């Protein structure tokens, strides 16, 4: 994420890595009223009433560990009725961050490496990059919130029922069929 694209985010809270210590640092975020409308538009939901995030960040050398919880009150449009309905989300967050150079070194294969792809389900995700010595907690909040949204939200109690099949109009060839049968 570049600095210019961070300016367009509706909810941005950059945090300098130097301010994070070995002991966990608590950071609480809450979107203001003006930010909520922009967040709703950004996420493609009908409205956002509340957005709060509580994070705990700790540092181990150049790496940063982030854990926390996002709480959001939103309105999404039902895919069946198109009516807005309330949605409460509680999203757990757990991420590791590392400097960009360290991530690039991890991704660069050496000449001795074989091309052997093995996917392990219990393998941890690679760390997120620390860009220019900062971590944007607003960006983290928006990403995890977007991933937690139901892509096909359905209002509770609403069921989709297929429309009744239309009775086909009488074919022009039906008259020929009747003539052939002698009716």
Regions found by a protein language model. Name each.
Residues 2-183:
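Acidic and generally charged, gly/proline-rich low-complexity regions
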């Amino acid at each position: 994420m570049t600095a210019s694209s961070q300016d367009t985010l509706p909810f941005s809270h950059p945090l300098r890595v130097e301010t994070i210590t070995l002991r966990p640092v608590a950071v609480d975020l809450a979107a203001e009223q003006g930010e909520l409308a922009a967040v709703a538009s950004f996420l493609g939901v009908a409205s956002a009433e509340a957005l709060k995030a509580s994070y705990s960040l700790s540092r181990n050398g150049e790496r940063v560990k982030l854990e926390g919880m996002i709480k959001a009150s939103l309105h999404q449009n039902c895919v069946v009725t198109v009516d807005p309905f309330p949605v409460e989300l509680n999203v757990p967050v757990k991420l590791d961050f590392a400097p960009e150079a360290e991530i690039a070194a991890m991704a660069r294969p050496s000449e001795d490496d074989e091309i052997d792809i093995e996917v392990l389900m219990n393998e941890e995700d690679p760390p997120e990059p620390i860009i220019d010595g900062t971590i944007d907690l607003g960006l983290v909040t928006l990403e995890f919130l977007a991933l937690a949204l139901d892509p096909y939200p359905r209002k509770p109690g609403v069921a989709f029922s297929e429309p009744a099949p239309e009775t086909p109009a009488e074919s022009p060839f039906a008259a020929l069929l009747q003539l052939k049968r002698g009716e």
